Curated annotation (Swiss-Prot):
Signal peptide: none annotated. The modification N6-carboxylysine is found at K100. This is Dihydroorotase. Zn(2+) 1 binds at H14, H16, K100, D248. It is an enzyme of class 3 (hydrolase). The keyword Metal-binding applies. It catalyses: (S)-dihydroorotate + H2O = N-carbamoyl-L-aspartate + H(+). Its EC number is 3.5.2.3. The gene is pyrC.
Amino acid sequence: MTQKLTITRPDDWHLHLRDGAALAAVLPDTARQFARAIIMPNLKPPVTTVAQAQAYRARILAALPAGLQFEPLMTLYLTDNTTAEEIAAAKASGFVHGVKLYPAGATTNSDAGVTDIRRCYPALEAMQRAGLPLLVHGEVTDPSIDIFDREAVFIDRVMTPLRRDMPELKVVFEHITTKDAAEYVRDASGPVGATITAHHLLYNRNAIFTGGIRPHYYCLPVLKRETHREALVAAAVSGSPRFFLGTDSAPHARGLKEHACGCAGCYTALHAMELYAEAFDAAGALDKLEAFASFNGPAFYGLPRNTGTLTLEREDWELPAELPYGDTTLVPLRGGETLRWKAR
């Protein structure tokens, strides 16, 4: 049984850092484990221009504690009005590494998102020419579609036609949650990748309802059946370079999670690599963790691998039940419970 594992320092290819006091509270957790992260643009107001991305990047770097090295990889928020000129400026900036597609209303702060993908074709064609990846929240928002089916329907209604029209557009299918998505990415032609969260590798939808409503397991896309979780694990440990680490760590104040209409999102930045190690260990595939966490993402994005290392040791420790979050607190996923791995 492996007791200690040292890997190339990993990256997080899907992260929510928020802004202001919340940013200052959560950024150190990510920077202690990850060298780089793709930063989601769904602030209020959203990050829709290169100038806004540059300003947000400066705020992130200003909040980084002394002694920690971390590079934020910025993204733009795609809207119906995003121009080809803004895409060209994003590519030329050197610090914008993708453009995020949120179907309007699909998740937290997505109200300004895309209402019809066809309205974005001029911008998407510019992205295809520039080699700038499209990062996709892959769920339809049609209220007639069951929430557990929205990812699979998105593949048929949006992803397949989009990739038929733009076969060379680099696409990341973010935080995939279904067997359908895993098989789509595995079998697709052209430049397609996918991020997978730790919580979707570890849990199925029963976790939300064990002994009552468990709001800290509620995220979007929502956890799915066990057959889907098993398919995600199989994809993550397969060795395919198309699958890579993206925590989708999404901090919310405790009172906004434990609420009559609670926010979606799991906070995992503090203990992300410990959770991934647990998932890969359970699958008997610790030897596949480094490629998933440290190699596949940089290869897809055309970036060099990191030069530092991170060590994981088999060691029991208790995760704090709650963490400071501005003038309030947040509850990490599995808060107050014992974890079996420790990152150093």
